Amino acid sequence: MGGCMSREASEEMEQRKKSQAIDREIMDDSRRLRRECKILLLGSGESGKSTIVKQMKIIHQNGYTVDELQHYRLTVYKNLVDCAKALIDAMRQFDIVPEHEANKEHMEFLYTFQVDPDPNVPLDLHVSKAVAALWDDPAVPSVLEHQSEFYIMDSAPYFFAEAARIGSPEYIPSEADVLRARTKTTGIYETRFTMGQLNIHMFDVGGQRSERKKWIHCFESVTSIIFCVALSEYDQVLLEEQNQNRMLESLVLFDSVVNSRWFVRTSIILFLNKVDLFRQKLPRTPLSNYFPDYSGGPDVNRAAKYLLWRFNQVNRAHLNLYPHLTQATDTSNIRLVFAAVKETILQNALKDSGIL
């Protein structure tokens, strides 16, 4: 009888060991699933990388506090004034004179105006009135016909339209303002957030040419790369080099990334961004003017597919490419896109861990 009890105890112990082993395996699988993911945001300057980071804060980090919104006030002031100066430069470059006499004085005032570096000092009321009046001048559409020949921020029409609100003494930037506010990214900025079962470390890297040598520090153990391309830049020139087409520059940069030895096992998520501006621009500025082998006319889907094909052509390493049409300033669009991005990252994580 003692032998029987000993055998039962032995079997029970064996079952307990098996159960513990299964529990450990489940926990290990869970840890592998809830893995740390390093995402590198790459792309040329003004392709929308920093806007994506801001959207992650809105979607995954409870948005901006009033204090954080206030922090962008000075940036918005500078953006508004810089856009006005860019418009004035273009009017002078193309010998376009405002039709309303008062706008000649507004141009002189705006061109010499300097934003107060103290963010607590409201914008001079004369600035917002002068900007609004100049933007409404009948001569301005003639300037915008030359938009591919001079540099102005994509957000210029937005800020011009909002000039009166921005010029209010009580002005606090909205999240929409923050998404469109532009500061040059220098160095590398990390954002951390949780997305379902994934702990994301997202790195926003400076897009200007002078910043690219710093990317090397982020290359190790990258899970995915989100490469941002501004579709609307097909007729634009670089801020750093006015005779270099921005889309061709993006293709060169993408070539160097996708075929790099650092990214042999990395999935590339391609954000074909600024689709809203792309849609507006195609009817008035044919894509075929800049890419003569394109024959799809102003159809936005055909044009986007053509540019995607151009990016696929340089993918000689045959990395998995996951393209998405995006509008980085639209929170609902980015929320939907990142739901798909999460699935892509999760599937690749499962494959890497051997679960799939």
From Swiss-Prot:
This protein's name: Guanine nucleotide-binding protein alpha-2 subunit
Membership in a protein family: Belongs to the G-alpha family. G(q) subfamily.
Entry binding sites for GTP: 46-51, 154, 179, 185, 207, 273-274, 276, 328
UniProt-listed PROSITE patterns: G_ALPHA
Residue stretches of biased makeup (Basic and acidic residues): 8-21
The keyword Nucleotide-binding belongs to this UniProt entry's keyword annotation: yes
Region (G4 motif): 269-276
